[in-house]
Amino acid sequence: GRRIMGETPEQQGLDTMWDNRIWVHVLYRITTAFHVLHEGLGPKLELTSNHGWGEHCRKEALAHAGLVDRYLSDGRDWLLGGEEPTFSDITLATAIAFSKYPVNATPLDERFEHLAAFWQRWLGRPAFLAAYADRNSGVPELDDRA
């Protein structure tokens, strides 16, 4: 079967690199901004409120999302350029989905052309939509579809 992290050692290295970059510099930054900008999440989720740090994290996430957007601008559908997504693509889709929570106010697909096309490719995949079949994700675009 297909290898989710790439077929060759080079592809596997690139997939790991992109996965780490997206997790650390995009998804984790959006998650951190969410936690430090919002109160009332409870002691297990709520970090110390710090609006300055939250805005810094939001800006950093946007800057790195711009880098990923430029990388996708060569016309590739997926980060490694293959016909199917790899693990790093799943991490990027997760980052875009989390950015779309209304309280985050950082919808990456609305800010970056190639991330928008990337997101639309995920929305066209039945297996991706099946993961949101309960329509309780908090992302209106996934929950309110016909």
Question: Where are the regions that the model predicts?
Answer:
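GST-like domain detector, emphasizing the conserved glutathione-binding G-site
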Residues: G1-E55
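Surface-exposed helix-capping loop/turn segments at secondary-structure junctions
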Residues: R70-G82, P126-Y132
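GST superfamily/GST-like fold recognition
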Residues: L80-A105, A116, W122
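Acidic/histidine-enriched, glycine/proline-rich intrinsically disordered or flexible terminal extensions
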Residues: R135-A146
